[in-house]
Amino acid sequence: MRQNDNEKQICPIPGPQGLPFLGNILDIDLDNGTMSTLKIAKTYYPIFKFTFAGETSIVINSVALLSELCDETRFHKHVSFGLELLRSGTHDGLFTAYDHEKNWGLAHRLLVPAFGPLRIREMFPQMHDIAQQLCLKWQRYGPRRPLNLVDDFTRTTLDTIALCAMGYRFNSFYSEGDFHPFIKSMVRFLKEAETQATLPSFISNLRVRAKRRTQLDIDLMRTVCREIVTERRQTNLDHKNDLLDTMLTSRDSLSGDALSDESIIDNILTFLVAGHETTSGLLSFAVYYLLTTPDAMAKAAHEVDDVVGDQELTIEHLSMLKYLNAILRETLRLMPTAPGFSVTPYKPEIIGGKYEVKPGDSLDVFLAAVHRDPAVYGSDADEFRPERMFDEHFQKLPANSWKPFGNGKRSCIGRAFAWQEALMILALILQSFSLDLVDRGYTLKLKESLTIKPDNLWAYATPRPGRNVLHARLALQTNSTHPEGLMSLKHETVESQPATILYGSNTGTCEALAHRLAIEMSSKGRFVCKVQPMDEIEHRRLPRGQPVIIVTGSYDGRPPENARHFVKWLQSLEGNDLEGIQYAVFGCGLPGHHDWSTTFYKIPTLIDTIMAEHGGARLAPRGSADTAEDDPFVELESWSERRVWPGLEAAFDLVRHNSSDGTGKSTRITIRSPYTLRAAHETAVVHQVRVLTSAETTKKVHVELALPDTINYRPGDHLAILPLNSRQSVQRVLSLFQIGSDTILYITSSSATSLPTDTPISAHDLLSGYVELNQVATPTSLRSLAAKATDEKTAEYLEALATDRYTTEVRGNHLSLLDILESYSVPSIEIQHYIQMLPPLRPRQYTISSSPRLNRGQASLTVSVMERADIGGPRNCAGVASNYLASCTPGSILRVSLRHANPDFRLPDESCSHPIIMVAAGSGIAPFRAFVQERSVRQKEGIILPPAFLFFGCRRADLDDLYREELDAFEEQGVVTLFRAFSRAQSESHGCKYVQDLLWMERVRVKTLWGQDAKVFVCGSVRMNEGVKAIISKIVSPTPTEELARRYIAETFI
């Protein structure tokens, strides 16, 4: 049973005694509020209460209490008095909105993907542009000119966020001696908000002149924001694909709404203020600490010299700057530039076991004190020591002990942007200059508004020998006119015909197929393809007068997550609502489900049938691919060639182009940011990778991840991992085409492509992260190679591989285009032809093997590492994602997204008394480890558990009996009953070789649970599932097929 909160002893919250009317205003030094509050916090650890300006604040000073407040099921953001004053300028923008406000949810869903890791990475050139302007100014001023560091960092960070997010240039470094009017108004606005927050309301109301000045400042800032919007609309830069473009053009996939003009202004102002103010403070404090800690400055400069040297700083260098990364972390620990955040409980709560708080109470997290909690950071918590923030130490810190970017869904969405910007600027400064304080006796004093910065911090910047920034920049400009090292992929455009390609996809396969089809349609015909999820169709209006192609999967008879509303709409149609719609449907079947006749291909079949019944005209019969047995790219290509194109030619009077490179001319394709594969993924950090198996068997690894606050999963859910191709595969391509890894590719395309366009990208990055290098070559790509072959014998052989010998030699040996090009030289094939023939890199899905309630904010994966192909080939055909995960080390960054489980593949809720039977082999144990962990948590909460059996198959106890000790402990606690089958040690499992043998041996107990309405969950290979299903059907006979389908739920993999 759960403990009764009423039994806890309630204690008053301590704090300094205030004065009537004035409260605690005399306890705070208003000129040094942060540091004087820190003294109070050390006296009243871990919590205190005081009254300021008529507002009572409960201040949190410890990591333990903060951890409670970070539970978003108990607490939510409180818009404190200071933020309430900011609302006069930003209204319900992302930072100042209340949780319940509609515009916050709308803006958050639209804009979070715009700050995804790949989008941030692509902003590096613009960041570098502004940072070089800072360095050029310092170089021109010379070593004897005092520099106001805070002012210059303010110019840098404002110009950076404006250029990267909105394509707007403030040109702050070209307005000599003065700030842009926006900055002046912003500084006054923030300072006034801080001032009003310290004054009783009756005094604040008398400050008429100050209020008038504030309104003028708000008007000026919002006018600047309107000018930014107007300029974008007038220039019609619809290919910018930046934050402003997202705000102006995107619609929310959940509600269908777009941001209003006023909401756009609110959020532009929010980003311009919050997007530069705290980052300029971070840089200022970081440089201050380096200037006053010579040992740290020397180490930092040494690291930059080792990693970057005299090269131009690139995005690849940043991940290698471990010490600089630690410097920034340690700086924000000691001086969090956004000093805190506030929450309030949903209902009365007891925190710390004895302090009562109520809804409406302002619980203010004082980060400067929390980050110095001696219980976490020790006796030297007040000292600047970057070494404590190296990855290996940082990852071992207790949860919620470092929170400079806030918490949960209300945390800063621009964190990755700010981090990349600050790291790059700091590295560029240390590469180019030696710094020294103007006043070597300088004592830190804070300049406080609603953020904090050093006050009156001046330094000299002496250019380092051989590091002339001006000469380097001129050299870059000169070199940019030469073609060497710059490869541009440009294509012609032709008179076009629109086409719409819709997809439904949980795992990314159908999305990748949709993009591949778009490329093909733009090459063979004259189509301009719009690719989007089915649920993205506005008002469910399918376009007429153009082909509509639908590519979708079916998940146990249910539509994919991004197709549910579309399917529901289809089912509501009446009469000939779809008359004039010309369509075709391609369906993917999940492995292991083809024998459920009622669900296999159910959704594609349903869509195809309903559209025909309501007046739609089929362009082609429905196509399909069983992903357990077929290569979906090959099947899609075959269906397109044999079925779709004849239908398109007849319906749209087309003449097909015979493209020699397999892709031909390109057409522009606009992919909305929430659905591009990379924008849809977030950043997770690897905590641990450990091998679970003996060296004598297939390797399986346990990967522990720290998840972003935005990912909240349940047992049974999956993580989609966007991998990188191996270095070996990338190097094979580079060697084949004789180009360097740092060769810059500039892809200009006005057509369907999943590649990054209109931005420089290195050959290494493109090949690593955007295309499938090991995908089996398709017949079309082989015919394209044959057409380009200059040798007749090679051409004939390639043509044979595309036809008669395809199944046995290409598909049978898993030959990729790379394998074939290495074996059969086709000199006329260039890198752009090759890249265009490759499908986009798609995410791989893994079931989470942990319960979120056991370790909040963390998840684990159990991965079977495919180290070689099951069948022979000319090369080691290692699994891309599994080897990528196995090669990770603590601190590695992964791109992940949450994929919800089949609603039936869920652990029954706490109120359910039905037993469960779990059956797994190998890494298929992943979801059941999560189930068992969740059951253990419930048991500790006093919940009576229904019976649970886990049947697990592996080779031998000493080889691959995964999580043995952990599961045995759970069995001893009564959480689960275990049954193991050892295929190579049958004597140790009662003569049973496989799990189906074990099930049959225990058939009496299994049937008993079945009679209690048990559900059977299975996870493993297709073959294992087939054997288990046959045995279960035999044990529970004569159960009706429909009931068996309802109570037998399987997840299978190939």
From Swiss-Prot:
* Cofactor(s) it depends on: FAD; FMN; heme
What GO cellular component term, any one, is given? Answer: cytosol
SUPFAM superfamilies membership: Cytochrome P450, Ferredoxin reductase-like, C-terminal NADP-linked domain, Flavoproteins, Riboflavin synthase domain-like
According to the entry, every stretch annotated as the Flavodoxin-like domain falls at 499-644
Give me the reactions it catalyses. 2 oxidized [cytochrome P450] + NADPH = 2 reduced [cytochrome P450] + NADP(+) + H(+); an organic molecule + reduced [NADPH--hemoprotein reductase] + O2 = an alcohol + oxidized [NADPH--hemoprotein reductase] + H2O + H(+); dodecanoate + reduced [NADPH--hemoprotein reductase] + O2 = 10-hydroxydodecanoate + oxidized [NADPH--hemoprotein reductase] + H2O + H(+); tetradecanoate + reduced [NADPH--hemoprotein reductase] + O2 = 12-hydroxytetradecanoate + oxidized [NADPH--hemoprotein reductase] + H2O + H(+)
Entry EC number(s): 1.14.14.1, 1.6.2.4
Q: Give the residues the record marks as binding heme.
A: 412
Asked whether the keyword Ligase is assigned, the reply is no
Q: Which GO terms describe its molecular function?
A: aromatase activity; flavin adenine dinucleotide binding; FMN binding; heme binding; iron ion binding; NADPH-hemoprotein reductase activity
Task: State the protein's name.
Answer: Self-sufficient cytochrome P450 monooxygenase CYP505C3
User: What is the originating organism of this protein?
Assistant: Aspergillus oryzae (strain 3.042) (Yellow koji mold)
This protein's encoding gene: CYP505C3
